[in-house]
Amino acid sequence: MENKDKKRQKKWLLIAAAGILLLITAAAVCVYMLPIGVLPVKDYSRMEALPADHLLTAEEVWADREQCIRIVEETHPYFITAEEQSGYAAAREHYVAATNGPMTAGDFQSATAEFLCFFGDGHTGVRWVEEEYLNLPQVYADGKTWNVDENGVRLHSVETIGGVSVNEVYAAIDRIFPAENEMARQRNRQQRITGRNILTLAGAAIQDDTVTVTFSDGVEAEYTFRQPVSNAVTSQEGSGPINRWYMDGDVFVIDFNQCNDDDEMKAIAADLKNAVDHGQTKVIIDVRGNPGGSSNACTRLLNAMGMAAPQYDVLVRFSPLAQQGRGYFRQSGEFCFTGSDAAVKRNESVRLAVLCDRVTFSSATMMCVYVRDGGHGVLIGEPSSNMPSAFGDILYFSLENSHVNACISHKQFIRPDEANTERMLVPDIQTDPQDAYEAAMDWLAQ
């Protein structure tokens, strides 16, 4: 009898051990297969830029070119999803031809930026730095650059800068900076046209830090370079990553400047939930000028209003760079997550207006897509420069010899409304970004 008990006990111990081993194996497989960060993340440090006229040897150029091509082909989801890749082959061939010998660091950076621009991905490109801009107040509108007065009123269109046609400067900008849609192209031109490095690349004459600009009325004027970094005229760009809420009459307004899912955002969401639970029916979420961050901050706000967002389809590509930056176990392959619309939950008692502009990007654009595809409210303002379905989740890298700093996507996000392939998310109510808030208040007053 005692021997039978021992055998039975041994049997159950073996079964338990096998079960534990099976669970460990299943967990290990999940950790390996899923995009879960389990390994230590390698800190990325941006390399200090070399002087633009620093001469790279042919060997240094070739080494950096091959490093860039290898990282791109190992990392970007394009190589998983694109059935036709002849366009990339041509871009690569052009890059190789343009970097086939000794050249300056500035010229190599420009060639690399043009190569990365092929993907038309706002999350992939050279991290171009401009330290000085012409002190020319300007705005890009109707296909032209206009100088403006202190009130932002257009005066005359710019014809030449430093003796170079403004169209040649546009062409240089379009070659260097990726644009996912027409709004992105307009934003790039407005932000970049007065940068010293771009003007130098376009061949503009610069004398003693002064550039001559001619206008459509025939007038010539001299402008000098200045700091700080940007002179772009946008609704809220530069307002800083500070999120807050306030009441404007009977409207709960969230000034959502950056998608940080932090304690500050949790407190805002808690206050919003409390307000909705006690009868708040009018809400504005202002993502004008919001460059993105974590989409969890967006879903947190929707959940606080008794809403649930539809889900994106997501493709994650594993690579050595992604392993360094995210701690994935795998260095190759991909993982696909298929989103579900079944989770969508609306709250018909809440009237929601989301304000957006061309600077709204990445996770902030996702907020707009959640609202549009989930039927949660209306969008007011101008389209985002980010496509509704887009590449994203940035990884950073630097090229060893040239010190070119760049970034690249390792995921692809497909919007919940998969059949909609529009490149721009056009708001329900289109207005100048500066007028979006007033338009939202008018809509909520109806």
Model-found features: residue ranges?
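Flexible, low-complexity junctional segments that flank or bridge functional domains
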Residues: 2-283, 289-291, 307, 394, ...
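C-terminal "post-core" interaction segments
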Residues: 39-48, 55, 59, 66, ...
